[in-house]
Regions:
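Amphipathic alpha-helical coiled-coil/heptad-repeat segments
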Residues: 1-179, 183
Length: 186
């Protein structure tokens, strides 16, 4: 249901934020590698460890078997759809739904993995790659945050609608009971 989907999105957003934090550290390490006298092989070991942590974050950003950040929920036919309501048109009932896509943080990891400051002859290009992947990870986090907020809003609306319907039904029941009591007293 919607609660499970919202929890999946919240978990994915947390994973994407973690990947963004790690991407920022990689950008800093690649920039540091441009400093004269730095042992670039040691810096590369740090980058390799960060990329490994990034992979772990992507794998662990799973809720109830759903991983919305590994790229499997991206593209036509792979979207996630959750039923968020019921509608009535004349005598026919149907459902309303909310559809969204996951993100592909695996592609970000792959691009970061390709950076090798230990052997690179173009550290400026490596830095541009790392910065581009950082921007992509921030976009992914933002997208998931927007989706999470949309689901929150829909859940709040449904809760309010349910409360209103409950109140309306209670009023009708109270009115029927008052009418019946008046009839019995007559």
């Amino acid at each position: 249901g919607m609660t499970a989907t919202k929890n999946s999105v919240a978990t994915a957003r947390l994973g994407a934020e973690t990947v963004s934090d790690i991407a920022q550290q990689i950008v800093e390490r690649v920039a540091f590698a441009q400093t004269d006298g730095v042992d670039r092989a040691d810096v590369q070991l740090e980058i390799d460890a960060l990329v490994k942590n990034m992979g772990t974050a992507i794998e662990q950003a799973t809720f109830n078997g759903d991983n919305l950040v590994d790229g499997t929920k991206v593209g036509v036919g792979n979207e996630v759809t959750v039923v968020n309501g019921v509608k009535r048109t004349g005598a026919t009932f149907g459902t309303t739904s909310f559809t969204f896509e996951g993100v592909d943080l695996g592609a970000i990891k792959t691009a970061m993995e390709a950076i090798d400051v230990g052997t690179s002859t173009d550290l400026a290009a490596d830095l541009a790659t790392a910065e581009g992947q950082l921007a992509a990870s921030i976009t992914a986090s933002t997208s998931l945050g927007i989706t999470e907020n949309a689901l929150d809003g829909q859940m709040e609306f449904i809760d309010s609608l349910t409360d209103t319907l409950d109140s309306g039904v209670s009023s009708m029941v109270d009115a029927d009971m008052e009418e019946e009591a008046a009839r019995l007293q007559a």
